[in-house]
Regions:
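N-terminal glycine-rich phosphate-binding loop and ensuing alpha1 helix
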Residues: 1-60
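Residues at the starts of beta-strands that form the adenosine-phosphate
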Residues: 2, 47-49, 75, 128-129, ...
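Short internal beta-strands
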Residues: 49-53, 131-133, 275
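Conserved beta-loop-beta/alpha segment of the NTase-like Rossmann-fold superfamily
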Residues: 60-145
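Catalytic-core segments of class I nucleotidyltransferases/pyrophosphorylases
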Residues: 103, 110, 115-123, 135-138, ...
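A structural motif detector for beta-strand N-caps
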Residues: 232-235, 239-240, 244-253, 257, ...
């Protein structure tokens, strides 16, 4: 099995932070989310990984080259896009990479899902595409539960499910992909033509799309407060994590915080539900539910 990480998006829901850092490099407890994904794939025994790039691609490419040097057993093939091609276009642009069944994962997904379960299900499904679904925040995927068959997308219903951003495909299906289209639209067209798209329903694992600030902060809260275990992240026994010594007088930490190294905090400051990045400078004041850089 091989894997492909979709990572070319502009991250508009994370502005203004994505003006300086591409979404795949957003740190979770100090570790880029794409590094967490790469480590998960490595621990699964996957040694060939493809990834597409567009927004602030030089920063992402430099990180990937550094990761590969540290992990020479992993081969990373980078597919640069001169313009955004959509998720379907990204697959077509890298079609020569897809020689066998491939695990595809969005680069903004934080999860502790056991990918091996998807692999075994895929091989028994006789379906060219299997999408991992759960009961989540955006329940717009309609599924025939009896046959694990997806019926439609983008219809909000109470009984519907949320796509986790994790799927597996047979490369033979790529010949049906039109250029520059979203994968969801492509799959709906395939369903309309009678091609089965299967659902792997998983409600016992953690999935968080960190593609907006609310969810980015919530992911930290889930790990620090609810003690959700992501094996590829550092475990902290307490919800107040302060890694800097540059702290003024009368600084108060509440609820949970993750304060990175080299952060400077002025005196008379209160921080609650806050994540800082390295070298952040925090002026005196009260901060709650914010990312400070």
């Amino acid at each position: 099995m091989q894997a492909f990480i979709l990572s070319a998006g502009k991250g508009t829901r994370l502005l203004p932070y994505t003006k300086i850092l591409p979404k795949p490099l957003f740190p979770i407890l100090g570790k880029p989310v794409v590094e967490i994904i790469l480590d998960q794939l490595k621990n699964l025994g996957i040694t060939l990984i493809g990834i597409n790039t567009f927004h602030l691609k030089d920063k992402l490419i430099n990180f990937l080259k550094s990761y590969q040097k540290k992990n020479p057993q992993i081969k990373i093939r980078i597919f640069e896009e001169k313009e955004l091609m959509g998720t379907g276009g990204a697959i077509i642009n890298a079609k020569n990479f897809f020689k066998e069944e491939t695990l595809i994962i969005n680069s903004d997904i934080l999860t502790n899902f056991n990918f091996e379960k998807l692999y075994y299900f895929f091989n028994q499904s006789f379906s060219p595409v299997v999408m991992v679904l759960h009961k989540g925040e955006n329940n717009n995927v309609e599924v025939d539960i009896n046959s694990n068959t997806i019926i439609s997308f983008r219809k909000q219903k109470e009984d519907n499910l949320t796509f986790t951003g994790i799927q597996m495909i047979d490369p033979k299906i790529i010949k049906y992909f039109p250029f520059k289209k979203d994968l969801i639209d492509i799959y709906q067209n395939l369903i309309n033509k009678g091609i089965k798209i299967s659902a792997f329903i998983e409600n016992n694992s953690y999935f968080k799309d960190i593609g907006n600030i609310k969810n980015y902060l919530k992911a930290h809260e889930d790990i620090l407060i609810k003690k959700i275990k992501i094996p590829e992240t550092t475990f902290y026994s307490k919800p107040i994590v302060v890694k800097t010594k540059n702290i003024g007088n009368n600084v108060i930490f509440k609820d949970w915080v993750y304060i990175e190294e080299d952060t400077f905090i002025e005196a008379n400051t209160q921080l609650s539900k806050v994540v800082t990045w390295k070298r952040a400078y925090i002026k005196s004041g009260i901060y709650e539910s914010q990312v400070l850089i």
